Amino acid sequence: MKKVAIIGALLMLAGCAEVENYHNVVKTPAPAGLEGYWQTNGPQRSLVSPEAIGSLVITHAGDTLDCRQWQRVIALPGKLTMLSGELTNVTVNRDLYAIEREGSTLEYDGMTLQRVTRPTAECAAALEKSPLPTPLP
C-alpha cells in the first residue's frame, strides 16, 4: 500500500496529468494561427517507421483529429484544452499531448509537424467517415 502512495505522489510531482472523463474536458478555442492542417515531413523518431506519417487537424473551435498512418490509419478525435498552463490535445482515448508552436512548426508527441494545405487522402477519408463537430479549416 505504501508503494502505491509513493508512486502516486511521484506522478503528481512529475507533473503527470490524467483525464477521468473525456466529455468533461473543457474545450479551448485554437489560438491564432494554430487552426489548420499539420503533418510530419520525413522520418520521425516517435513513429514506428520512416515511412509513417503523423497529422494533426485543428479547427478554430478547438476540435482536433490526431491521424497517424503507416500500414493502416489510426485517427483519434480530440479537443484542445489548457492543462497546467500548457495547450494540450486530449484524445477520446484520454491521451494527453502538449502542443508547442514556433512559426510554422509544431512540436507534438515527439514529432515535428509542418503546416500543410490539406490532410493526406487517408486522413481526409477518416474525417469524412467521422466528421469533427465543428467546421474544418
What are the roles of these predicted feature ranges?
Residues 79-99:
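An anionic, turn-rich surface loop/hairpin at beta-sheet edges
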Residues 1-4:
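Positively charged n-region of N-terminal signal peptides that target proteins for export
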Residues 40-85:
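N-terminal glycine/threonine-rich, aromatic-flanked beta-hairpin/loop signature
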Residues 12-15:
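C-terminal motif of bacterial Sec signal peptides marking the signal peptidase cleavage site
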Residues 108-137:
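C-terminal partner/receptor-binding element of secreted or periplasmic proteins
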Residues 68-73, 91-96, 108-117:
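Secondary-structure transition/turn motif
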Residues 17-20:
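Bacterial signal peptide processing site
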Residues 22-39:
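N-terminal helix-cap/turn-to-beta initiation motif at the start of protein domains
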